[in-house]
Amino acid sequence: ADLISPWADVKLDVQAMPFPSSQFDVVICNHVLEHVQSDIKAMGEIYRVLKPGGFAILQVPIDISREKTLEDPSINTPELREQYYLQRDHQRLYGRDYADRLRSVGFRVDENHFVDELPLNLVERYALPVGEVLFICNKPD
């Protein structure tokens, strides 16, 4: 699913998904939450559509030098967003508090560092960002 992509089989806004609650076993949301107006609302929607016992992988760009996510309504032009959030269409720049934001909607979060354990040739082959943490978010039973 995607809001814009012509290849998506379902067009949707992740902040208001047209699915019943407890519909999916797995949700993968890769570098989307930094683009939406309300990431907390989107996280809550993902939590809602997951079945109990299901999990989501929710990846975002993170500036690990930041303790807290930078999110300021006065950063509201493409130029300012690029300057502060590193991309013209981003709504925020996540910090080390990202997992806490996920927990705030009910997820149990596992910060998985598996990329660090892979041989460099596989990291390069699959274009994995070195040091990227996988945020595996479980919905309790």
Report each predicted region and the residues it spans.
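Class I SAM-dependent methyltransferase SAM/SAH-binding core
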Residues: 1-16
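Histidine- and/or cysteine-centered catalytic micro-motif in compact active-site loops
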Residues: 3-4, 32, 61-63
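Conserved protein kinase catalytic core
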Residues: 8, 19, 65-67
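A short acidic, Gly/Pro-enriched loop at the edge of an enzyme's catalytic core
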Residues: 12-27
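Short, flexible active-site loop motifs that bind/organize anionic cofactors or intermediates
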Residues: 14, 29-32, 89
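A short SAM/SAH-binding and catalytic strip from SAM-dependent methyltransferases
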Residues: 25-37
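S-adenosyl-L-methionine-dependent methyltransferase catalytic module, highlighting the catalytic core
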Residues: 37-47, 51-141
